[in-house]
């Protein structure tokens, strides 16, 4: 909440000239329908509520059914907080029994002027079919590249911390790690020193059978589970210090191609920086969401930043630094790459309004 921007982002703009004064201000849309996923639900409610209300709107949430109870509780806490400082009640609302059908009805309601949606292709498609302004935060599969010029110990620690944060449930977290071959083994060993457990040989296959069904689909019940819980399922018992599972795989492995949303990080070898960036671009799937790179080469950092073309690009830090944690800038949990708003602020949830007065109000 402390890192989420408020009304201070809504600065008016005035221009005076020979023909008078022009004033531009940011105006509220009114009622916003905010459709949220089961991943990172409570923090998203807090973040979206602050930014949307700061812009002068009210919001009605359509939660994922799996996150119903915690989100409804948070809405109640936020409304009580608003009332306690003299604000009106029920600025934040929710569907009592959330479902895809109920969320669709909400988005299409005539009083809803703006739709903000975070989710898969299905719900995003429905949002665009409503004929309203849509702010869409799509999926991500963020790659991280480590080259031979990086501070290898720091890079390994940052990647482990970023990929294991909230058990990899966040869309910005490192989902695959591409390492240049000359430093691959060193980075892998340093990751193990910082809390990673390496799968080898048949162990990789065993974990795949746990987290994927027979049709190759991700089994959602494993999303967000602790690394030790997943390892226990294949008969490996580790201490609480283990927070991430790593495994060396090829670039086409399901661990690389899928947004796993669990603390499993595939490691992929690359022979040079251009190959590493090529692998990262393919793995990112053109979502233009988030990417990271650890390097002391300005040329390599520039090359990847320009080619990967993501909304967030973190240099020499963990993924969560891109949201202002141990990094600069504001925090957002609605990263609207598909519709171009990027890291949303209160300004994202406003309309630009202009007022012009002819021939008056200029004082010089």
Provide a role label for each language-model segment.
Residues 1-22, 193:
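N-terminal Rossmann-like NAD(P)+-binding subdomain of aldehyde/semialdehyde dehydrogenases
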Residues 109, 137-139, 170-173, 258-263, ...:
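Short glycine-enriched loop/turn motifs at secondary-structure junctions
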Residues 12-154:
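Rossmann-like NAD(P) dinucleotide-binding subdomain of oxidoreductase/dehydrogenase enzymes
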Residues 46, 124-251:
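ALDH superfamily catalytic-core signature
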Residues 107-110, 151, 212-220, 259, ...:
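Short, surface-exposed amphipathic charged segments that create phosphate/polyanion-binding patches used
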Residues 236-364:
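Conserved C-terminal structural/oligomerization subdomain of aldehyde/semialdehyde dehydrogenase
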Residues 60-65, 178, 316-317:
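Short internal beta-strands
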């Amino acid at each position: 909440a402390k890192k989420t921007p408020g009304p201070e982002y809504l600065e008016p703009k005035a221009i005076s000239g020979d023909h008078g004064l022009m004033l531009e201000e940011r105006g509220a849309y009114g009622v916003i329908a905010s459709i949220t996923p089961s991943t990172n639900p409570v923090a998203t409610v807090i973040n979206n509520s602050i930014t949307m209300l700061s812009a002068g709107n009210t919001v009605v949430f359509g939660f994922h059914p799996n996150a119903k109870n915690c989100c409804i509780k948070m809405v109640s806490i936020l409304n009580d907080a608003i009332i306690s400082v003299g604000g009106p009640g029920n600025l934040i609302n929710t569907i009592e029994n959330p479902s895809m059908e109920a969320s669709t009805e909400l988005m299409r309601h005539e009083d809803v002027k703006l739709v903000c949606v975070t989710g898969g292709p299905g719900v995003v498609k429905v949002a665009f079919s409503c004929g309203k302004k849509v702010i869409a935060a799509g999926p991500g599969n963020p790659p991280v590249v480590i080259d031979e010029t990086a501070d290898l110990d720091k890079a390994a620690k940052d990647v482990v911390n970023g990929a294991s944060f909230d058990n990899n449930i966040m869309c910005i977290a490192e989902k695959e790690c591409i390492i240049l071959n000359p430093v691959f083994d060193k980075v892998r060993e340093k990751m193990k020193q910082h809390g990673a457990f390496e799968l080898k040989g048949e162990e990789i296959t065993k974990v795949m059978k746990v987290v994927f069904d027979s049709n190759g689909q991700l089994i959602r019940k494993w999303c967000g589970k602790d690394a030790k819980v997943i390892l226990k399922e294949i008969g490996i018992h580790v201490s609480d210090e283990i927070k991430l599972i790593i495994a060396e795989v090829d670039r086409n492995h399901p661990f690389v191609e899928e947004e796993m949303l669990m603390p499993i990080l595939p490691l992929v070898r690359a022979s040079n920086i251009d190959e590493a960036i090529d692998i990262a671009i393919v793995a990112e799937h053109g979502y233009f969401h988030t990417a990271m790179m650890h390097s002391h080469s300005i040329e390599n950092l520039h090359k990847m930043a320009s080619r990967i073309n993501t909304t967030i690009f973190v240099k020499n830090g963990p993924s969560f630094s891109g949201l202002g944690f141990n990094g600069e800038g504001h925090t957002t949990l609605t990263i609207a790459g598909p519709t171009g708003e990027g890291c949303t602020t209160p300004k994202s949830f406003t309309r630009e309004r202009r007022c012009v007065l002819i021939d008056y109000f200029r004082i010089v």
